[in-house]
């Protein structure tokens, strides 16, 4: 029995959906452990497209148990809407195949509004959030004033918790000249949907312990990417949760010894959505080509992604931070038309060479990438399923990438289709 954690090794949008879908087919249990509905997966199964934001990818598979862990912040209205959306496509979501941690924190309307207010006020200094209330909800969690799923069970307790959290938020809203939130109205709205949320609520840590004893395969599904981690990412241009593999333990209530393999999803080039440092960003025709061929638009926001060359220095760093055992290299086929391909192998900062990304954002913004150039292969890799059938220059690029980052490539994706994958190592069977 092996348990696998999937994380993004860059800034998110690495193509986790396809890989997670393939792994979830082999897993018994699939668990989301951090983030909210600010990041999404697009799955295509038997010609049907599913866009998931909160629900784990296992939900579209029969005989799988899908779980939202305590580390996730949940917008209850968005969750119910997503459930109805996939139900309309024939997917079953019931108390037998879906569980929400009773300790998960809720995103409420004033969180969304606060997110928007801050982003609008920040001007050029904005973070580039999805304006869905994720950050403010995590702030309330850390501030010990949050409302959790379990609080929906008691009207008296909910009233008290709302009073506490609104004391904080309404004080800020008054200072900003905004209308205050009415406690009774919000309580009424929450009590109205409470039964639909509570029927899925369980102590997730206890269920995971049972699954481990039953030798079930567990897939921990990360959202976003390591470079957006609140501690280890390009702070302050990060998300509000820990996106590294170790967050799977804290975000679900299982010990770190429950993790046996960490798979880092890694794009063959680099993208970033929103603001923040991006050493290898391309603003020329090549950047546009990568964006066009890679269809680089966000699943949740439809925002255009910034594109650039593969940054080996960054990926090598995230591999060390997250304890990645192997990478799934995605979107190799996007590079098919290029005459030459570059890989960042070092940085220069104020005339000095560096082999890692410094922590200070001021330094990150000044960094100059140093590249190694590889000849392109100028032929299609799309649909190839055996590494020996790849063009020689494509293989050379992969081997050089693997050697530089110091971690094996466990699979290579050669198109958005699930079947178009070169499998070199199955994380569940290592």
Curated annotation (Swiss-Prot):
List, in alphabetical order, the GO biological process terms annotated in this UniProt record: 'de novo' AMP biosynthetic process; IMP metabolic process
Its pathway, per UniProt, is:
Purine metabolism; AMP biosynthesis via de novo pathway; AMP from IMP: step 1/2
Q: Alphabetically list the UniProt keywords.
A: Cytoplasm, GTP-binding, Ligase, Magnesium, Metal-binding, Nucleotide-binding, Purine biosynthesis
Instruction: Name the Pfam families on file.
Output: Adenylsucc_synt
Q: What is its EC number?
A: 6.3.4.4
* Record's subcellular location: Cytoplasm
GO CC terms in record: cytoplasm
Specify which residues bind GTP according to the UniProt entry for this protein: 12-18, 40-42, 305, 331-333, 413-415
Which cofactors, by name?
Mg(2+)
Q: Which GO terms describe its molecular function?
A: adenylosuccinate synthase activity; GTP binding; magnesium ion binding
InterPro entries to which the protein is assigned, alphabetical: Adenylosuccin_syn_GTP-bd, Adenylosuccin_syn_Lys_AS, Adenylosuccinate_synth_dom1, Adenylosuccinate_synth_dom2, Adenylosuccinate_synth_dom3, Adenylosuccinate_synthetase, P-loop_NTPase
Summarize the protein's role: Plays an important role in the de novo pathway of purine nucleotide biosynthesis. Catalyzes the first committed step in the biosynthesis of AMP from IMP.
Q: What name does the UniProt record give this protein?
A: Adenylosuccinate synthetase
> Which gene is annotated as encoding this protein in its UniProt record?
purA
